[in-house]
Amino acid sequence: PEITALVETGTVNSPVIEVNPGPCFRIAGLNLAFEGRSAEQDEIQEAMSEIGVSEGDIAIPAEIIDVERQLSQFFQNEGYAFADVSNRRVRGDREAATLNITYALDLGDRVRLGETVLPEDSETDAEYILDLQPFEQGEIYAPSKLSSYAARLNELRTFRIANVRLSDEPTGESPEGDAIHD
């Protein structure tokens, strides 16, 4: 954009700011580049159809940035617990007023839920706590499964705080080749 500031003189001096915003840029291309493991083609197509922008849309910076969150969330819901957009590359063509955007995505391993491990110093009935678990061992990870379990535990009002999370490191590998996290 071009911004010009000037003062008009006359009986009363008045400031004038003229703004020429330039051309309205549109999205010409949206791409994913995977660092390490790549997703399946059908997952990629579904992810691209669910994000909030598409080719031909007006390029609104806040929406372009929010796609990072949407992509991370989509792939986490597909079982890639540690999926994260690590970089965004934007290439613009001033003459055509278009942008090509590439999101670099690090999926990590697909995660299956392992054994639920309670704190060693827990005085609670372990069997009862495990019965509240809304998933089976070996299921594909989804953030909603862990948050649902935490909500169930908090509803008991037995604990000051109930924290449900994946182990930092995998504890095994499933027959399908997915990482198992307790």
Model-inferred region functions:
Residues 1-182:
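Periplasmic polypeptide-binding modules associated with outer-membrane biogenesis and secretion
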